[in-house]
Amino acid sequence: SGRCLILADGFFEPHTYVKPGTKTEKKQPYYITLPEQKLFYFAGLFNKLDEELYTVTILTLDANDTMAKIHNAKKRMPLILDEQFQENWIDPDLNENQIKELITVSFTNEALKYHPVSNAIYKRGVDTNTPDILKAVPAIDPEMDESRPTLF
């Protein structure tokens, strides 16, 4: 077992919307990337179960303002490592205090880009391994509608 890097170009997080005057929750997935869909690494942990089988988990932490707006029910976000900290994360010689410090300072400062996508990613039998799944759709939550006019 140990620490690892998990390569990605984007990820999905659910946004929860409750229409005013109701108690019915609706979830809408959002696709989140770095600018220009630049590749990045999540901070991960792995376990080797046998010679051919590993398990992996992505570390999460309290959401920043942007991610709290998107993942508004649990207010968590994955730890996206800034480039300067990627090698540090997999250094086997780090002690527990160094690891904790790294977790608090290593999140990327790049602005995250996001847009709502189809609920099809939640459906069984739908091929989600296609570029169409990443296309923007209208936001169900008016507060999240980037196209609506603002007063400021």
Feature names for model-found ranges:
Residues 1-152:
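A structured binding-face within diverse protein domains that lines the active/interaction site
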